[in-house]
Curated annotation (Swiss-Prot):
Catalytic site: 151 (proton acceptor)
Source organism of the structure: Cavia porcellus (Guinea pig)
Keyword match Transmembrane: no
Subcellular location: Cytoplasm
Single biological process term from Gene Ontology: negative regulation of cell cycle
UniProt protein name: 15-hydroxyprostaglandin dehydrogenase [NAD(+)]
Gene3D superfamilies the record matches: NAD(P)-binding Rossmann-like Domain
Amino acid sequence: MHVNGKVALVTGAAQGIGRAFAEGLLHKGAKVALVDWNLEAGVKCKAALDEEFEPQKTLFIQCDVADQEQLRDTFTKVVDYFGRLDILVNNAGVNNEKNWEKTLQINLVSVISGTYLGLDYMSKQHGGEGGVIINMSSLAGLMPVAQQPVYCASKHGIIGFTRSAAMARKLMNSGVRMNAICPGFVNTSILQSIEKEENMGPYIEYTGHIKDMMKCYGILDPEMIANGLITLIEDDDLNGAIMKITTSNGIHFQDYDTAPSYAKD
């Protein structure tokens, strides 16, 4: 898919990886709906982008993605404003082992809800023109993380859901590709949360172990994750792909050979 002229919806877009995604898409010529619960950060993000891009190229919508009604209204507003939806990036995420229900609701349930809402607008079965859905996972979705079991579970769930939903694409003829991104540690506010008891709960005493892992794996810039996003969108052969991004190996893919023949293009 060529990004130029397309309409994208990015959750968690006001800062960090989400903002890098928005900037990357805008540089490629897309129009972007900036969706975030943080009103102040969202307004500042929109204002900053307006200085570099035409103001009509972006739309900020405050939304708690864990609220199904708000999320549904957000999709409606985006399509009403831009007239279409071609790209969905389910990026919003948190790290909270203490309030683990919140972590699952935002990291996993909202991704599933967002995907189905996106399909309502993009699927050829529903009169859409097809599109691409990218879900944000993590290397924690590919391996156990003793200090963050719930965060880890949510990211594993994203991979299982994305691969399965992508497999169903050919069976359902939706015309919508789905892929996931699994970066290592990224320089965002989530890294700061590992030092807060209100986020880590009983695992706060293991913060030193996580910091040791950071030293081992290194820390990525959000812009590198945005480069991976563009690759997943533009390569029409990628469906059900799980992209890994690390400081040591850059952008590469998890190797799977488990898809039945009927699901392969």
